[in-house]
Amino acid sequence: MIMWQSLILISSGAALGASLRWGMGLILNPLFAAFSFGTLIANYLGCFIIGLIMAMIWQHPQFSGEWRLFMITGFLGSLTTFSSFSAEVMENFIQQKWLIGLGIMSAHLFGCLIFTGIGVLITRWLN
């Protein structure tokens, strides 16, 4: 596949995923003012879809590379990065690599919280 074809597939999927996430936020976030319900549902949906795709790929290794670029890298990548994180952890758990899976979980959770905190602190410091 030519590079520009890959970029079109990824970009098309990303546009759809980002639009869905935005729409879910518009509709669901106002329902619970103190909680980003749209984001939570987007993460849950992305994890559910990547679980379906992972299982299909495991059962059918000939699964199209183009479809993976469109759905996983593009659509789910823009809908949520949590789905990729979830897939990596689950893949290790399924392979009974418990410590690696727990390590990935810890690194993502604590690392993201730390970097979010650093971003908040830097913004406060600059203002």
From Swiss-Prot:
**Cross-referenced InterPro entries:** FluC (IPR003691)
Give the subcellular location: Cell inner membrane
Could you name the domain of life of the organism this protein comes from? Bacteria
Q: How is its activity regulated?
A: Na(+) is not transported, but it plays an essential structural role and its presence is essential for fluoride channel function.
Cited Pfam families: CRCB
Q: Which UniProt keywords apply?
A: Cell inner membrane, Cell membrane, Ion channel, Ion transport, Membrane, Metal-binding, Sodium, Transmembrane, Transmembrane helix, Transport
A GO molecular function term, named singly, is: metal ion binding
Instruction: Give the record's GO biological process terms.
Output: cellular detoxification of fluoride
This enzyme catalyses:
fluoride(in) = fluoride(out)
Q: How does it sit in the membrane?
A: Multi-pass membrane protein
Major subcellular site: membrane
- Annotated Na(+) binding lies at 77, 80
What is this protein's function? Fluoride-specific ion channel. Important for reducing fluoride concentration in the cell, thus reducing its toxicity.
Q: Which PANTHER family is this protein grouped with?
A: FLUORIDE EXPORT PROTEIN 1-RELATED
Q: Would you identify the family this protein belongs to, as annotated?
A: Belongs to the fluoride channel Fluc/FEX (TC 1.A.43) family.
Provide the protein name.
Fluoride-specific ion channel FluC
Q: What is the lineage of its organism?
A: Bacteria, Pseudomonadati, Pseudomonadota, Gammaproteobacteria, Pasteurellales
